[in-house]
Amino acid sequence: MLAAYAARQSADDPLSGLEVGERPDPVAPEGWTTVTVRTAALNHHDLWSLRGVGLPADKLPMILGCDAAGVDESGREVLVHAVIASPGWSGDETLDPRRSLLSEVHQGTLAEKVVVPTRNVVPKPAGLSWEQAACLPTAWLTAYRMLFTHAGVHPGDTVLVQGAAGGVATALVQLGSAAGLRVWVTSRDAAKGEAAVALGADAAFASGERLPDRVDAVMETVGAATWSHSVKSLRPGGRIVISGATSGDAPAKAELTTIFFKQLQVIGSTMGTRDELERLTRFVAARGIEPKIDRVLPLARAREGFAAMHAGQVDGKVVFTL
């Protein structure tokens, strides 16, 4: 079958290890199902795998990809949930210390077929296109859990999204706007801030700019570069939900005094559960949300999508079709 896979790894030249070609068809073990992939989406996780982060070298060659939508063995249209719990685990799979994502231990979704545990598929709502459905299982699920599981916000509350352009940030803007939140964004690039406003944000500010009001919650994926601003922007009792640190994880100042004096909460968040993915798909379909897609390419041209993401030339999701 056709697949995009990591054949080698290089921290300096990640694209050198990407191959697009034939791989053996997967065989589903007992309790797993085979999904024939219709669409799959690209994530920065795939580039990190090519750099050698999170993917052990002894697992190569590894088919990349966490996001996919397709048809399961019974003919149902489904989305694939990428978080694989360890055998015997019950409860929230994101808390399983032995969990993995597709393409870390088990072969990923950038292929004609992928095998996953039977519980790791959720129905695709009829109102979602194949391309839209493929956008949801990673970045959008991460955003959904941040906003609706951890942030503790309600319609009318103000949420600050640090960094307007990333995949999670874009999803936060679209989800927050649809949920009746007042969404503010920051960006170093005025054009990207304007693009976020066009997607539904209520206002955009320069990175680090003093805000007109304190906010109820901050959605943090940037890390060190925005940490102090995030802490200082919160009202007393507010929450920072952090799911990434793209600028580094060691801020110059931890702001501990402000955190305890203002009784702030700092909450870590990673991916989401299968049930959250199912709720997300229903929410997106019911509200008529259209995930922002930068480009749609056949999987045979996967290298073009990887190269665009590596160069920072994407604005929205890159989706591959099969």
Which stretches of residues belong to each language-model region?
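C-terminal capping/lid region of NAD(P)-dependent oxidoreductase domains
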Residues: 1-2, 212, 288-292, 304-322
